[in-house]
Amino acid sequence: MLKFVVVICLVIMAITFAEKCGDQECGEGTCCLDYSQQHCSRLGKLYDMCSDPNDKTDSGSHIFFCQCETGLRCDKTSWSCQKG
């Protein structure tokens, strides 16, 4: 039981101290996602799920997926990164 309590406390601490992000804080090749918590995630590679680069929240974060990396586009039919 004590181990369970310790694990729960660690999870709560991790959530409490999680770094908030914006695209300015995320490094090159990443974007800020606002999915349950804000966190940096890598840009979409070929066939990865993606979001339109213009679809952002008021704070500048993406909701579920990052935009595609340079040279790829987000196909709005399949919502996946495709070539050019």
UniProtKB/Swiss-Prot annotation:
Q: Which residues form the signal peptide?
A: 1-18
The keyword Amino-acid biosynthesis appears for this protein: no
What Pfam families has UniProt attached to this entry? Answer: MIT_LIKE_ACTX
Keywords of the record, alphabetical order, are:
Disulfide bond, Secreted, Signal
- Which Cys-Cys disulfides exist here? 21-32, 26-40, 31-66, 50-74, 68-81
The record's Gene Ontology cellular component field reads: extracellular region
Q: What is its main location?
A: secreted
- Do you know which InterPro entries this protein is assigned to? Atracotoxin
The name this protein goes by in its record = U1-hexatoxin-Iw1a
Organism of this sequence: Illawarra wisharti
